[in-house]
Amino acid sequence: MLTTQSLVERFKLEVITGEAGLNKQIKNTDISRPGLEMAGYFSHYASDRIQLLGTTELSFYNLLPDEERKGRMRKLCRPETPAIIVTRDLEPPEELIEAAKENETPLITSTIATTQLMSRLTTFLEHELARTTSLHGVLVDVYGVGVLITGDSGIGKSETALELIKRGHRLVADDNVEIREISKDELTGRAPKLIEHLLEIRGLGIINVMTLFGAGSILTEKRLRLNIHLENWHKEKLYDRVGLNEETLRILDTEITKKTIPVRPGRNVAVIIEVAAMNYRLNIMGINTAEEFNERLNAEILRNGNHSEGNNQ
């Protein structure tokens, strides 16, 4: 549960009053700058959001008649409001301090500029309040691409990850990957604290990757871009040999590119994953070798067809 207290500690904010409300839960990632509310319009006041008061809001408030000030601040401070933050180290009005104290609404000050603080708070809240799920697999950073390796138990996911680590890539999580949907089409993965930096190898046991290979071999968190699904080779199954078939893996409401790699003796899966990651980066840059080959093949078929028609005439 994310509370106002954790926000104060994270951004080193100063609490002026309303300490009793520091345990309030923050449920909304949106942040408000109550400009219209300062003017007296509270019909659509989003009171469950964190409220930011900067130079603009307080300058307007100071222009209000004395008889309106107290009522305006009482309407602003609601029991469900997680916090009111005054930015730029500005002095909170006395009416605001009194209203916050009455309603046990945390009144906080910050030295940071309003826009900058709003951006930092939004990023933090989106990360902390994001939808989460867990998947069985291994997450590795390969050439800057977050690769989620999945497959049946015993297929060789951890062994493949170990080979990738030896080749200079970085482990994020093994066995259990905690995934957050930060925003639309953006997933990040990390390891649970209990198994952070650990890798399980059958017959060998649990190893500490950071201790064995150094700090450069691990990564705390990585955005998921590519799913490599390992499965035993089936003779009757037709595998993609050109690269035109586009598979996706849906996690929460986001889809990522998926490649199914058949596993059998003699195949170096780690190298295949390296190439898959590099090829994915090329695709993002607009270079698709499979499509180029397909266009070249179609052009050759068309040329041969026209040549045959000419000979028949």
UniProtKB/Swiss-Prot annotation:
<keyword id="KW-0460">Magnesium</keyword>
<dbReference type="GO" id="GO:0006109">
    <property type="term" value="P:regulation of carbohydrate metabolic process"/>
</dbReference>
<keyword id="KW-0418">Kinase</keyword>
<dbReference type="InterPro" id="IPR011104">
    <property type="entry name" value="Hpr_kin/Pase_C"/>
</dbReference>
<feature type="binding site">
    <location>
        <begin position="151"/>
        <end position="158"/>
    </location>
    <ligand>
        <name>ATP</name>
    </ligand>
</feature>
<keyword id="KW-0723">Serine/threonine-protein kinase</keyword>
<keyword id="KW-0067">ATP-binding</keyword>
<dbReference type="GO" id="GO:0000287">
    <property type="term" value="F:magnesium ion binding"/>
</dbReference>
<comment type="similarity">
    <text>Belongs to the HPrK/P family.</text>
</comment>
<feature type="active site" description="Proton acceptor; for phosphorylation activity. Proton donor; for dephosphorylation activity">
    <location>
        <position position="175"/>
    </location>
</feature>
<keyword id="KW-0511">Multifunctional enzyme</keyword>
<dbReference type="GO" id="GO:0000155">
    <property type="term" value="F:phosphorelay sensor kinase activity"/>
</dbReference>
<protein>
    <recommendedName>
        <fullName>HPr kinase/phosphorylase</fullName>
        <ecNumber>2.7.11.-</ecNumber>
        <ecNumber>2.7.4.-</ecNumber>
    </recommendedName>
</protein>
<feature type="binding site">
    <location>
        <position position="200"/>
    </location>
    <ligand>
        <name>Mg(2+)</name>
    </ligand>
</feature>
<dbReference type="Pfam" id="PF07475">
    <property type="entry name" value="Hpr_kinase_C"/>
</dbReference>
<feature type="region of interest" description="Important for the catalytic mechanism of both phosphorylation and dephosphorylation">
    <location>
        <begin position="199"/>
        <end position="208"/>
    </location>
</feature>
<dbReference type="Pfam" id="PF02603">
    <property type="entry name" value="Hpr_kinase_N"/>
</dbReference>
<keyword id="KW-0479">Metal-binding</keyword>
<keyword id="KW-0119">Carbohydrate metabolism</keyword>
<feature type="region of interest" description="Important for the catalytic mechanism of dephosphorylation">
    <location>
        <begin position="262"/>
        <end position="267"/>
    </location>
</feature>
<dbReference type="GO" id="GO:0005524">
    <property type="term" value="F:ATP binding"/>
</dbReference>
<feature type="active site">
    <location>
        <position position="157"/>
    </location>
</feature>
<dbReference type="GO" id="GO:0004674">
    <property type="term" value="F:protein serine/threonine kinase activity"/>
</dbReference>
<comment type="subunit">
    <text>Homohexamer.</text>
</comment>
<keyword id="KW-0547">Nucleotide-binding</keyword>
<dbReference type="GO" id="GO:0004712">
    <property type="term" value="F:protein serine/threonine/tyrosine kinase activity"/>
</dbReference>
<feature type="active site">
    <location>
        <position position="136"/>
    </location>
</feature>
<dbReference type="InterPro" id="IPR028979">
    <property type="entry name" value="Ser_kin/Pase_Hpr-like_N_sf"/>
</dbReference>
<dbReference type="InterPro" id="IPR027417">
    <property type="entry name" value="P-loop_NTPase"/>
</dbReference>
<comment type="function">
    <text>Catalyzes the ATP- as well as the pyrophosphate-dependent phosphorylation of a specific serine residue in HPr, a phosphocarrier protein of the phosphoenolpyruvate-dependent sugar phosphotransferase system (PTS). HprK/P also catalyzes the pyrophosphate-producing, inorganic phosphate-dependent dephosphorylation (phosphorolysis) of seryl-phosphorylated HPr (P-Ser-HPr).</text>
</comment>
<feature type="binding site">
    <location>
        <position position="158"/>
    </location>
    <ligand>
        <name>Mg(2+)</name>
    </ligand>
</feature>
<keyword id="KW-0808">Transferase</keyword>
<feature type="active site">
    <location>
        <position position="241"/>
    </location>
</feature>
<dbReference type="InterPro" id="IPR011126">
    <property type="entry name" value="Hpr_kin/Pase_Hpr_N"/>
</dbReference>
<dbReference type="InterPro" id="IPR003755">
    <property type="entry name" value="HPr(Ser)_kin/Pase"/>
</dbReference>
